């Protein structure tokens, strides 16, 4: 949905168009899942819309390099998991991209539970598959306890969609 334009190396606005398919939910044999890609994790509205549409597990495939992004990687998605009562699988690549070498991709893929706790985490420098057993009953337990969706006030958020509100 959102396209970054940052230095060094991420000049994606020149090569890609923003997505326009909205936030679809995919019903699998195991859970309802939603996907928001890389840069979209910086926009909490993406995770919120997926959760409001019924997603139980969100996935965020990313290719992000060390620096400030690494701090945000540990902060944003656990916060989104709590705010939306979902599991999140945050996956990031590792290594260098030759020949450009504009930064080290720091891996650190993880699963976070609806309470914001990281339940399994990958390494910073090895290609690997991160696997977790997710108890979907935790979603209902957390949502019933914290009631964030019940207490939403959409009537107070209209400025978010009004032209010129930024």
List PLM regions with ranges.
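Active-site catalytic loop in hydrolytic enzyme cores
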Residues: 1-56, 66-79, 145
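Short, Asp-centered acidic motifs that coordinate Mg2+ and/or phosphate
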Residues: 56-57, 87
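Catalytic phosphate-donor-binding core of small-molecule kinases
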Residues: 75-76, 83-87, 93-96
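C-terminal beta-strand edge segments of enzyme domains
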Residues: 92-166
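Short secondary-structure boundary segments
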Residues: 61-63, 91-94
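A generic fold-level signal
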Residues: 18-20, 83, 104, 124
């Amino acid at each position: 949905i959102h396209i970054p334009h940052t230095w060094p190396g991420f000049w994606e606005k020149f090569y890609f168009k923003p997505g326009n398919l909205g936030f679809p939910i995919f019903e699998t044999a195991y859970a309802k899942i939603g996907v928001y890609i890389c840069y979209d994790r910086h926009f909490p509205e993406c995770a919120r819309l997926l959760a409001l549409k019924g997603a139980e597990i969100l996935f965020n495939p990313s290719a992000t390099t060390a620096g400030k992004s690494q701090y945000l990687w540990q902060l944003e998605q656990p916060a989104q998991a709590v705010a939306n009562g979902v599991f999140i699988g945050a996956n990031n690549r590792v290594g260098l991209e030759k020949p450009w070498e504009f930064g080290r991709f720091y891996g650190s893929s993880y699963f976070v539970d609806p309470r914001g706790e990281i339940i399994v985490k990958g390494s910073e420098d090895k290609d690997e598959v991160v696997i977790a057993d997710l108890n979907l009953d935790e979603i209902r337990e957390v949502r019933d306890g914290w009631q964030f969706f019940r207490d939403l006030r959409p009537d107070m958020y209209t400025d978010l969609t009004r032209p010129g509100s930024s």
